[in-house]
């Protein structure tokens, strides 16, 4: 029989869909919620790991899954809010994972991610940063002017905050690929003659 705390954890995990990203305030339009952000961070981290030749995808996936879990209790704060709000993410994570079958993810995986000493932690942090850039491109496609105002700041992140060369190459490539090409160019008449057969 599963532990009660495990079931509670699953419900709390589901609440990530209700946690809006802190920077939504600045864009004035819908942005990905924490759960949506986490899914893309997992895939970005695996892509960076493969580009870097890092083989421990299990560790990377676990880190990516837990990297923002404390936000179920402390929310996600924007760069402006962080000046005034001191969220105790450590205590939130301790309480979140306490009594669950996933306690080791807090004591080991999350701690290792936050220390940023191993390559897997650096890859996940790079993925966390790159998801912001992907979403800004998507918002720009929807008509937001704010992403262009943030380009200088995001270039600084690229040059000074990204750890891996692969993440920097991905960042450089973001503007080269149209946000809509994945669906506009992928159909049985254009690129994949056998699609749908």
Give each language-model segment a name.
Residues 1-197:
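Alpha-helical, largely C-terminal catalytic domains
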